[in-house]
Protein backbone atom coordinates (compact mmCIF):
# COMPACT_ATOMS: atom_id res chain seq x y z
CA UNK A 1 0.00 0.00 0.00
CA UNK A 2 1.58 3.27 -1.13
CA UNK A 3 2.21 5.85 1.58
CA UNK A 4 4.02 9.14 1.69
CA UNK A 5 6.71 9.09 4.35
CA UNK A 6 7.30 11.91 6.76
CA UNK A 7 10.73 12.37 5.23
CA UNK A 8 9.22 12.92 1.78
CA UNK A 9 6.98 15.69 3.02
CA UNK A 10 9.89 17.45 4.66
CA UNK A 11 12.16 17.13 1.69
CA UNK A 12 13.49 20.27 0.05
CA UNK A 13 16.29 22.61 0.93
CA UNK A 14 13.96 25.56 1.54
CA UNK A 15 11.98 23.79 4.24
CA UNK A 16 15.10 22.56 5.98
CA UNK A 17 16.51 26.06 5.88
CA UNK A 18 13.35 27.53 7.38
CA UNK A 19 13.29 24.93 10.12
CA UNK A 20 16.86 25.74 10.99
CA UNK A 21 16.12 29.45 11.15
CA UNK A 22 13.03 29.08 13.25
CA UNK A 23 14.55 26.53 15.58
CA UNK A 24 11.09 25.71 16.82
CA UNK A 25 10.80 22.17 15.56
CA UNK A 26 8.46 20.66 13.01
CA UNK A 27 5.23 21.98 14.47
CA UNK A 28 6.18 25.58 13.76
CA UNK A 29 5.61 25.02 10.05
CA UNK A 30 2.66 22.71 10.53
CA UNK A 31 4.39 19.31 10.63
CA UNK A 32 3.13 17.78 13.91
CA UNK A 33 4.43 14.35 14.94
CA UNK A 34 3.23 11.68 17.33
CA UNK A 35 5.03 8.62 18.69
CA UNK A 36 3.71 5.57 20.51
CA UNK A 37 4.25 1.84 20.91
CA UNK A 38 1.60 -0.69 20.05
CA UNK A 39 1.48 -4.36 20.98
CA UNK A 40 -0.23 -6.89 18.75
CA UNK A 41 -1.21 -10.13 20.49
CA UNK A 42 -2.30 -13.23 18.58
CA UNK A 43 -4.44 -15.67 20.55
CA UNK A 44 -5.04 -19.23 19.36
CA UNK A 45 -6.96 -22.21 20.75
CA UNK A 46 -5.19 -25.56 20.42
CA UNK A 47 -5.67 -29.14 21.65
CA UNK A 48 -3.05 -28.45 24.33
CA UNK A 49 -4.74 -25.26 25.52
CA UNK A 50 -4.71 -21.57 24.63
CA UNK A 51 -1.53 -20.13 23.17
CA UNK A 52 -0.53 -16.55 22.46
CA UNK A 53 2.38 -14.42 21.34
CA UNK A 54 2.93 -10.68 21.03
CA UNK A 55 5.17 -8.14 19.39
CA UNK A 56 5.65 -4.44 20.21
CA UNK A 57 6.13 -1.91 17.42
CA UNK A 58 7.28 1.70 17.66
CA UNK A 59 5.08 3.95 15.54
CA UNK A 60 5.87 7.43 14.26
CA UNK A 61 3.10 9.39 12.54
CA UNK A 62 2.97 12.91 11.19
CA UNK A 63 0.70 15.12 9.16
CA UNK A 64 1.68 17.70 6.59
CA UNK A 65 0.04 21.09 6.00
CA UNK A 66 -2.03 21.61 2.88
CA UNK A 67 0.42 24.19 1.55
CA UNK A 68 3.09 21.53 0.98
CA UNK A 69 3.47 20.71 -2.73
CA UNK A 70 2.62 17.22 -3.92
CA UNK A 71 0.02 14.53 -3.41
CA UNK A 72 0.89 14.11 0.28
CA UNK A 73 -0.29 17.61 1.21
CA UNK A 74 -2.66 17.58 4.16
CA UNK A 75 -2.32 13.83 4.64
CA UNK A 76 -1.06 11.46 7.31
CA UNK A 77 2.14 9.45 7.00
CA UNK A 78 3.31 6.76 9.39
CA UNK A 79 6.20 4.35 9.74
CA UNK A 80 6.93 1.52 12.15
CA UNK A 81 9.93 -0.13 13.76
CA UNK A 82 9.83 -3.67 15.11
CA UNK A 83 8.99 -7.14 13.93
CA UNK A 84 6.20 -9.56 13.15
CA UNK A 85 4.55 -11.83 15.71
CA UNK A 86 5.79 -15.43 15.82
CA UNK A 87 3.56 -17.93 17.63
CA UNK A 88 4.82 -21.50 17.97
CA UNK A 89 1.95 -23.98 17.95
CA UNK A 90 4.07 -27.14 17.84
CA UNK A 91 7.71 -27.98 17.10
CA UNK A 92 8.37 -26.73 13.58
CA UNK A 93 4.91 -25.17 13.31
CA UNK A 94 4.90 -21.40 13.72
CA UNK A 95 2.19 -18.90 12.87
CA UNK A 96 3.45 -15.47 11.76
CA UNK A 97 1.43 -12.25 11.76
CA UNK A 98 3.39 -10.12 9.30
CA UNK A 99 4.01 -6.39 9.03
CA UNK A 100 1.75 -6.18 6.00
CA UNK A 101 -2.04 -6.22 5.69
CA UNK A 102 -4.00 -9.30 4.72
CA UNK A 103 -5.71 -9.27 1.30
CA UNK A 104 -8.60 -6.83 1.47
CA UNK A 105 -7.37 -5.35 4.76
CA UNK A 106 -6.16 -1.79 5.24
CA UNK A 107 -4.10 0.35 7.60
CA UNK A 108 -2.00 -2.44 9.17
CA UNK A 109 0.43 -1.94 10.81
CA UNK A 110 1.21 1.77 10.66
CA UNK A 111 -2.24 3.40 10.90
CA UNK A 112 -4.22 0.59 12.51
CA UNK A 113 -4.35 2.27 15.94
CA UNK A 114 -6.09 5.30 14.46
CA UNK A 115 -8.97 3.09 13.38
CA UNK A 116 -9.06 0.47 16.13
CA UNK A 117 -9.10 2.92 19.04
CA UNK A 118 -11.37 5.49 17.36
CA UNK A 119 -13.78 3.43 15.24
CA UNK A 120 -16.62 5.95 15.46
CA UNK A 121 -14.35 8.93 14.80
CA UNK A 122 -15.34 10.58 18.09
CA UNK A 123 -12.08 12.47 17.72
CA UNK A 124 -12.47 13.73 14.20
CA UNK A 125 -8.99 14.98 13.35
CA UNK A 126 -5.77 13.03 12.99
CA UNK A 127 -4.17 15.56 15.33
CA UNK A 128 -6.63 14.78 18.13
CA UNK A 129 -6.25 11.04 17.68
CA UNK A 130 -2.46 11.27 17.44
CA UNK A 131 -2.32 13.20 20.70
CA UNK A 132 -4.49 10.64 22.47
CA UNK A 133 -2.39 7.73 21.23
CA UNK A 134 0.87 9.41 22.22
CA UNK A 135 -0.06 10.74 25.64
CA UNK A 136 -3.22 9.32 27.10
CA UNK A 137 -4.18 5.80 26.00
CA UNK A 138 -2.28 3.13 27.96
CA UNK A 139 -3.28 -0.41 28.82
CA UNK A 140 -6.52 -0.35 26.86
CA UNK A 141 -6.92 -3.47 24.72
CA UNK A 142 -8.98 -3.48 21.53
CA UNK A 143 -9.78 -6.41 19.27
CA UNK A 144 -8.81 -6.03 15.63
CA UNK A 145 -11.72 -6.25 13.19
CA UNK A 146 -11.20 -8.55 10.23
CA UNK A 147 -10.64 -5.65 7.83
CA UNK A 148 -7.59 -4.58 9.86
CA UNK A 149 -5.86 -7.99 10.03
CA UNK A 150 -2.22 -8.53 9.15
CA UNK A 151 -1.25 -11.22 6.68
CA UNK A 152 -0.91 -14.60 8.41
CA UNK A 153 1.63 -17.08 7.06
CA UNK A 154 3.63 -20.14 8.04
CA UNK A 155 6.47 -22.22 6.58
CA UNK A 156 6.35 -25.95 5.96
CA UNK A 157 10.13 -25.84 6.52
CA UNK A 158 11.34 -22.99 8.74
CA UNK A 159 14.81 -23.18 7.18
CA UNK A 160 13.48 -22.71 3.64
CA UNK A 161 11.89 -19.31 2.84
CA UNK A 162 10.34 -20.67 -0.36
CA UNK A 163 8.01 -22.92 1.66
CA UNK A 164 5.98 -19.93 2.90
CA UNK A 165 2.22 -20.23 2.59
CA UNK A 166 -0.79 -18.16 3.57
CA UNK A 167 -2.81 -19.19 6.61
CA UNK A 168 -6.58 -18.68 6.49
CA UNK A 169 -7.58 -16.89 9.72
CA UNK A 170 -10.98 -18.55 9.51
CA UNK A 171 -9.50 -22.05 9.21
CA UNK A 172 -6.20 -22.53 11.06
CA UNK A 173 -7.03 -26.23 11.36
CA UNK A 174 -6.45 -26.65 7.63
CA UNK A 175 -2.81 -25.70 8.20
CA UNK A 176 -2.05 -26.74 11.77
CA UNK A 177 -4.43 -29.64 12.35
CA UNK A 178 -7.73 -30.32 14.15
CA UNK A 179 -8.55 -28.26 17.20
CA UNK A 180 -6.46 -25.23 16.23
CA UNK A 181 -8.39 -22.00 15.71
CA UNK A 182 -7.75 -18.29 15.85
CA UNK A 183 -9.45 -16.72 18.86
CA UNK A 184 -8.61 -13.08 18.37
CA UNK A 185 -6.01 -10.48 17.53
CA UNK A 186 -5.74 -7.55 19.92
CA UNK A 187 -3.95 -4.21 19.91
CA UNK A 188 -2.72 -2.33 22.97
CA UNK A 189 -0.90 0.98 23.38
CA UNK A 190 1.99 0.24 25.71
CA UNK A 191 5.24 1.49 27.23
CA UNK A 192 6.90 -1.92 26.77
CA UNK A 193 10.15 -2.01 24.77
CA UNK A 194 10.10 -2.67 21.06
CA UNK A 195 10.42 -6.37 20.25
CA UNK A 196 13.78 -7.32 18.77
CA UNK A 197 15.51 -10.55 17.82
CA UNK A 198 12.65 -13.01 18.13
CA UNK A 199 11.92 -13.40 14.42
CA UNK A 200 15.56 -13.94 13.46
CA UNK A 201 15.89 -16.58 16.16
CA UNK A 202 13.14 -18.54 14.40
CA UNK A 203 13.94 -17.63 10.78
CA UNK A 204 17.72 -17.50 10.69
CA UNK A 205 17.82 -16.83 6.94
CA UNK A 206 16.41 -13.33 7.56
CA UNK A 207 19.94 -12.31 8.60
CA UNK A 208 21.31 -12.99 5.12
CA UNK A 209 18.41 -12.41 2.73
CA UNK A 210 19.16 -8.71 2.32
CA UNK A 211 16.71 -6.78 0.15
CA UNK A 212 15.72 -9.69 -2.06
CA UNK A 213 12.49 -11.63 -2.24
CA UNK A 214 11.94 -14.86 -0.30
CA UNK A 215 12.24 -16.91 -3.50
CA UNK A 216 15.76 -15.59 -4.15
CA UNK A 217 14.84 -13.14 -6.89
CA UNK A 218 15.86 -9.50 -6.65
CA UNK A 219 12.48 -8.16 -7.79
CA UNK A 220 8.83 -9.16 -7.74
CA UNK A 221 7.54 -10.49 -11.06
CA UNK A 222 4.32 -12.01 -12.37
CA UNK A 223 6.46 -14.71 -13.97
CA UNK A 224 7.52 -16.16 -10.62
CA UNK A 225 6.39 -19.74 -10.00
CA UNK A 226 5.90 -19.08 -6.30
CA UNK A 227 4.07 -15.75 -6.23
CA UNK A 228 3.82 -15.52 -2.44
CA UNK A 229 7.54 -16.11 -1.88
CA UNK A 230 8.21 -13.63 -4.68
CA UNK A 231 6.00 -10.97 -3.06
CA UNK A 232 7.48 -11.12 0.44
CA UNK A 233 10.75 -9.59 1.63
CA UNK A 234 12.59 -9.04 4.90
CA UNK A 235 10.59 -5.86 5.62
CA UNK A 236 7.41 -7.92 5.90
CA UNK A 237 9.04 -9.54 8.96
CA UNK A 238 11.38 -6.86 10.36
CA UNK A 239 11.54 -3.08 9.99
Question: PLM ranges: what are they?
Answer:
Residues 156-239:
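Glycine-rich, aromatic-bearing surface loops/beta-hairpins
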Residues 1-13:
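Bacterial N-terminal signal peptides that target proteins for export
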Residues 12-21:
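Bacterial N-terminal signal peptides
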Residues 48-164:
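Structured domain cores in non-transmembrane regions
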Residues 31-46:
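Alpha-helical transmembrane signal-anchor/signal-peptide segments
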Amino acid sequence: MAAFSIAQWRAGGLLLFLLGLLGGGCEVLGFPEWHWRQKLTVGVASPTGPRSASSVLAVQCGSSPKWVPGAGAGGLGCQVQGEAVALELAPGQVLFALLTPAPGATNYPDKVAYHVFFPDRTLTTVEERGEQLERHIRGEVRELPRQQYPLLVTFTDLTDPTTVKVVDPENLAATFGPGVSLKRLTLEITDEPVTEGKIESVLGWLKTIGGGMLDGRRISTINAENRLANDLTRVDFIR
